[in-house]
Curated annotation (Swiss-Prot):
Pfam families: HATPase_c (PF02518), HisKA (PF00512), Response_reg (PF00072). SMART domains: HATPase_c (SM00387), HisKA (SM00388), REC (SM00448). This is Probable histidine kinase 1. It comes from Oryza sativa subsp. japonica. The modification Phosphohistidine is found at residue 375. Histidine-containing phosphotransfer domain (HPt) contains an active histidine that mediates the phosphotransfer. The keyword Acyltransferase does not apply. SUPFAM superfamilies: ATPase domain of HSP90 chaperone/DNA topoisomerase II/histidine kinase, CheY-like, Homodimeric domain of signal transducing histidine kinase, PYP-like sensor domain (PAS domain). The lineage of its organism: Eukaryota, Viridiplantae, Streptophyta, Embryophyta, Tracheophyta.
Length: 968
């Protein structure tokens, strides 16, 4: 027997089932194996002997809850496990005790036998027989436990000193007591376990659990009824086997066993069934939106989740789906999408508006720069040209007149360049406004040819041919059409040394290719400018051009332009539109083919040699092309070098509708009175004749266009229509031989006496000056009348012109008109004063608007010539004060309060009693160097009657006074 002891595992914690004092005496003798971890079950099974207090309400609350039910079920299972485990452990302990008892008895028997053997064999060898070997071996034959593996290979070794009978007797008694205590404890545990099981069965909350389930089911139904959904199950044939329908339209018995086709009809049913079939075929769930429109519940949108249902074998046996009504959400979603689209559109519009505003600001700055340039150049140029005209009326020798002629021509060239640049800038920036008026194409062609003939120095024939299908009157922008014709005729005359120059006007049978009229609007594919032409036209009658505005409330209407209230660029369905084709041809030097592509570009000419030899700025044709495209037409050229050129443009024009009450020719508005034979003539020819003598004027013909009172054209006096030869060597040959010579046209110009040869010639010179001045803005020719008429003696004096100015003066001083000149520039004051004095009128001069108001308060005037830009108070503000007083009889202090102290007071009212008494409207004529039409519109809006652009000449002043002054 060895001294080794069994090693006790450190990680094993076991509670001994033996009494606590069992090892006190023999702790030093034996090292016994501790029981396994299964012994913990016995410890867990201990119950308190003392009853404890229980909160029954809390217990019932926990038992009635879902968690309590779960815990109760777990508790029952746990106690069943504990009971089984305890019984097993007790059986194991009892078996072990029995085995140990048997070993003790065997040991006891061995001891007795050994004692007897020793007595019998005193002299024999004593063998030591281990008394516990069989017991130890039998010990490990018992059923093994899970915690007994630690002691399988260990042997119990007992010291020899403890191998005595008394020890084992005592040991056996202790084991007996321990076994009895264990059995008693087992019986106690069994009793308590049975008691707990009985208590658990008697207190099982079956009714509470049933109530909980009912409440949960009710709550589930309540949730489903509150949610707008449909839950259903369909079999493989898509027949309903279960459905919970939120919508009370159908009962369950109306749905169960039927398909969707048997229940509903309308939009969306077939689509949903196809998706269900796809889910069953693919075995994959899906979510879709379906739009239904059925007679049962109307238009609805559902979002549906569909999933397949599988059997145990994996076959698809149906589908489950959940559908929710999202009609309101879809409506809100569409509204939100619409709002987002609107916001995007609004943002794009704001961006575009910002860009347009930026472009507009840039355009306005450029336009303001051009206006400033025009004003700054025109102001000193006005002094030069006006003083030159005044100087031409004085006594000068031949050389002085020639120098003066060069001065006037050069000044006119500078003025023409300014006008071309301004016209081009207005067209390109979109500021050019086209205004529709009713005019007569024949008169326009005839007047253009007359003006060209008046300034012609070459042996050329000017001819015009008007087609029979051309209407007598059409509606269009007559000023721009005349500007285009004049520019083309001027170029033709300039580049033609011999032969003829002519205009051919006719109506096209078909409209221009690439252009169409849809919805009353003109469209052009070839040009982008005509498409926007309607935006540049005004519905108001023409009141002004680039230089002069006329008041529409005067009876002196234009002879060839009749105001119209229709927009030029807008053609209504009932309007008749004709396409006029105008060909301007010549037999001149022609244009090289390589130069044709560059012909209509700005500042470009056929060649540098042409530019040096013939002059010009290269802007005329560019302006013509843009004006034609702006009016919705096209401009083309056909030319062959050394054979001539033909410029052709096509324009849409509307035929004016005659009113029923205007059948009488006398009531119909006309530019020259009633229709005559000359109004419908089809051709004009201006042929050169012998040069009788020279007549010079010293006054430039090609000056800026000056239109007073809306007179866009001036019909020349009868000297141009009576087949009598002109003094400049040209005669008008007409196709009609009757009634043309006797027809007399009324005009705003001075009457011509046919009995006085000198007056006849002088009147013709002035008339040609007037005609030429009106088209100078569209031409580059700066030739004056003094260079048009030749004499056999060569250049001579201009005493006839001077005598004409002297005769035009008002001889009786008592009939002088009282004129107020409001001007701050000393040079302009000198010019206007000199011209008015030569015309025989008195003049008062003030330097700003405030002084003008003081002068009007003290004296009555027949006409006021007022500058626009002046210090202290400009002409526009002063005009508003004057018009306000004329309308109300008192000075309106609300127009500009800061000037109240100057125009208020009782003295002022008494001083102006003459104006209030007569109720007279004093004509106010604007005089400014700003040639933009917006400036003219501002003048008219302020109350001015007309507009004269600087530089001012005798003809402007004279026409203005003739129109607005009362007859002397």
């Amino acid at each position: 027997m060895g001294d080794e002891y069994l090693a006790e595992p450190e990680d094993e914690v076991a509670i001994s089932m033996w009494p606590e004092n069992i090892g006190d005496k023999h702790q030093k003798q034996f090292k016994m194996e501790k029981l396994g971890k299964d012994q913990d079950a016995l410890e867990d099974a201990n119950f308190q002997q003392k009853p404890s207090s229980v909160d029954l309400n809390r217990l019932m609350e926990l038992a009635n809850s879902e968690k309590g039910v779960s815990q109760m079920q777990y508790f029952v299972k746990h106690w069943e496990y504990k009971r089984a485990n305890t019984a097993r452990l007790l059986k194991e302990q009892i078996g072990l005790l029995c085995q140990q008892r048997k070993e003790i008895e065997q040991r006891k028997q061995q001891i007795l036998e050994e004692q007897q053997f020793q007595d019998e064999s005193y002299y024999a060898v004593k063998w030591q027989v281990p008394i516990l070997d069989e017991v130890y071996k039998d010990e490990w034959k018992r059923p093994s436990k899970k915690n007994d593996d630690l002691s399988h290979n260990q042997e119990l070794k007992i010291d020899a000193e403890y191998d005595s009978i008394s020890y084992w007797k005592e040991r056996a008694m202790q084991l007996e007591k321990t076994l009895e205590a264990s059995l008693q404890r087992e019986r106690s545990l069994e009793e308590k376990l049975e008691e707990n099981i009985k208590n658990l069965q008697s207190h099982t909350p079956v009714e509470e659990f049933s109530g909980m389930l009912k409440r949960a089911d009710y709550f589930l139904h309540l949730v489903l009824q509150s949610a707008p959904i449909v839950i259903a199950h369909q079999d493989a044939d898509l027949r309903y086997r279960f459905i919970f329908n939120h919508f009370p339209t159908l009962a369950d018995e109306d749905v169960i066993g039927k398909t969707d086709y048997e229940i509903l009809s309308g939009e969306g049913i077939e689509e949903m069934n196809n998706v269900k079939k796809e889910v069953m075929a693919s075995g994959k769930a899906t979510k879709r939106e379906f739009v239904f429109n059925t007679p049962l519940f109307g238009a609805k949108t559902f979002v549906t989740y569909i999933e397949p249902v599988f059997s145990k074998s994996g076959e698809t046996i149906g589908v489950n789906y959940v559908a929710m009504d999202i009609t309101d959400q879809v409506t809100r979603r569409e509204k939100m999408a619409d709002i987002r689209v609107r916001e995007a559109v609004q943002k794009a519009k704001e961006t575009e508006l910002s860009k347009s505003l930026h472009i507009t600001e840039e355009t306005m700055r450029a336009k303001q720069m051009l206006a400033t340039m025009s004003h700054e150049i025109r102001s000193p140029l006005s002094g030069v040209l006006s003083m030159a005209e005044i100087l031409a009326t004085t006594k000068l020798d031949k050389e002085q007149y020639q120098l003066l002629e060069v001065m006037l021509s050069s000044g006119d060239l500078v003025l023409q360049l300014i006008n071309d640049i301004l016209d081009l800038s207005k067209v390109e920036s979109g500021a050019m406004k086209l205004e529709a008026t009713t005019f007569r194409p024949r008169e326009v062609v005839k007047h253009v040819l007359q003006t060209a003939a008046a300034s012609l120095k070459k042996e050329l024939i000017l001819e015009g041919c008007i087609g029979d299908n051309v209407p007598l009157e059409v509606t269009g922008d007559v000023l721009r059409i005349r500007q285009i014709l004049t520019n083309l005729i001027s170029n033709a005359v300039k580049f033609t040394h011999e032969g003829k120059v002519g205009i051919n006007l006719h109506v096209l049978d078909k409209q221009l290719p690439g252009c169409r009229i849809e919805g009353g609007q003109l469209h052009s594919k070839a040009h982008s400018a005509p498409a926007a032409a309607a935006e540049h036209f005004s519905a108001s009658p023409r009141k002004c051009d680039n230089d002069t505005l006329g008041c529409s409330n005067h009876e002196d209407a234009c002879q060839t332009g009749i105001p119209s209230n229709d927009n030029f660029g807008e053609h209504h369905e009932g309007d008749e539109v004709v396409w006029l084709r105008c060909d301007v041809y010549d037999t001149g030097i022609g244009i090289p083919e390589k130069s044709l592509p560059l012909l209509f570009k700005r500042y470009m000419q056929a060649s540098d040699d042409h530019a040096r030899k013939y002059g010009g700025t290269g802007l005329g044709l560019a302006i013509c092309k843009q004006l034609v495209e702006l009016m919705g037409g096209t401009l083309t050229v056909v030319s062959k070098e050394n054979e001539g050129s033909t410029f052709s443009f096509v324009l849409p024009c509307k035929i004016p509708v005659k009113e029923d009450h205007s059948d009488d020719p006398d009531d119909m508005p006309s530019s020259g009175g009633d229709f005559t034979t000359s109004d419908i003539e089809g051709s004009f020819i201006f042929k050169p004749q012998a040069r009788p003598y020279l007549l010079t004027s010293g006054v430039s013909v090609m000056n800026n266009t000056k239109l007073i009172g809306g007179n866009q054209f001036y019909d020349p006096p009868n000297i141009l229509e009576d087949r009598k030869p002109f003094s400049n060597g040209f005669v008008l040959a007409e196709d009609h031989s009757t009634n043309s010579a006797s027809t007399a046209h009324q005009s705003n110009g001075p009457s011509v006496s046919r009995t006085n040869k000198e007056q006849h010639d002088n009147a013709m010179v002035i008339e040609l000056n007037r005609q030429a001045e009106r088209v100078s803005s569209s031409r580059g020719d700066t030739t004056s009348v003094s260079g048009l008429i030749h004499d056999e003696r060569g250049p001579c004096r201009v005493h006839e012109e001077k005598s004409l100015h002297k005769k035009s003066k008002c001889s009786p001083s008592s009939n002088k008109a009282k004129i107020l000149l409001v001007e701050d520039n000393k040079v302009n004051i000198m010019v206007a004063k000199s011209m008015l004095e030569q015309l025989g009128h008195g003049i008062d001069i003030v330097n700003n608007g405030l002084e003008a108001i003081r002068a009007i308060q003290k004296r009555q005037y027949d006409i006021i010539l007022m500058d626009v830009h002046m210090p202290e108070m400009d002409g526009l503000q002063a005009t508003k004060f004057i018009r306000s007083f004329e309308n109300t009889g008192c000075w309106d202090t609300s127009v500009k309060p800061e000037h109240d102290q100057i125009i208020a007071g009782s003295d002022n009212l008494s001083d102006c009693a003459h104006m209030k008494k007569q109720g007279k409207r004093v004509p106010i004529i604007a005089m400014t160097a700003n040639s933009f039409s917006e400036s003219a519109e501002e003048c008219l809006a302020a109350g001015m009657d007309s507009y004269i652009s600087k530089p001012v000449n005798f003809q402007n002043i004279k026409e203005c006074l003739q129109q607005y002054l009362p007859p002397q």
